């Protein structure tokens, strides 16, 4: 317990089930285990990773399908089959895929949070900017253009305190900490959803939010699917929380077959 902290990710039992410390009282802690706990008993070993629940941010996020703790379902299915066993620890981003990085900065350039090191053409229509992480400021010592895996070193950054850090294509970020931003722009442009009733009577602004309340079976998920399919946006992030299995199956079957009318892809 001396090395454990609130919200640390832990591994529980022989199967190393993934959990999170949600409460601490002296030498006792309450752990929320994110997997089936059958078979756990008194005396089972619990090991703290020493880090909070975090996600990986970098090239490869787009077109991916994850569970609630960012484990890639596609690669897990390939390795372990459709019945996912407990305790799987799979990296969120493919460690073997190679991306072409185009550097925009060079030796001696000063950088701060949000400054763009360079870009990766992640999809045919999305250019992924590799940026300096929040709370980091310093001077670029090295930065290379070329083909890299997400964990390869693409350069070096000398921080203001004199320490030197490697620059890679991937960043880790704790899920309970909001990403900082310099400012928030007011919504001024409508988002065309493709649903005439919504666009005419209940318009939604780009940068805004929408709430679709209703009882069971009223079509809330259908509206969500339609907005995700046809809205005038560059990128759709679909999150299914508490959805029926058949509804999520529809998403996985239909969305990859859609064609974006703006790009033809």
Summary of predicted features, one role per range:
Residues 221-264:
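Conserved P-loop
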Residues 28-34, 72-78, 129-130, 142-144, ...:
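Short, solvent-exposed secondary-structure boundary/capping segments
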Residues 214-215:
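The Walker A (P-loop) glycine that initiates the GxxxxGKT/S ATP-binding motif of P-loop NTPases
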Residues 78-124, 128-133, 149-209, 223-226, ...:
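P-loop NTPase nucleotide-binding/switch module
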Residues 1-85:
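N-terminal accessory targeting/assembly segments
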Residues 1, 29-35, 95-106, 139-143, ...:
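Short alpha-helix capping/helix-loop boundary micro-motifs
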Residues 21, 65, 116, 140-142:
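Conserved hydrophobic positions within beta-strands
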Residues 218:
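ATP-binding Walker
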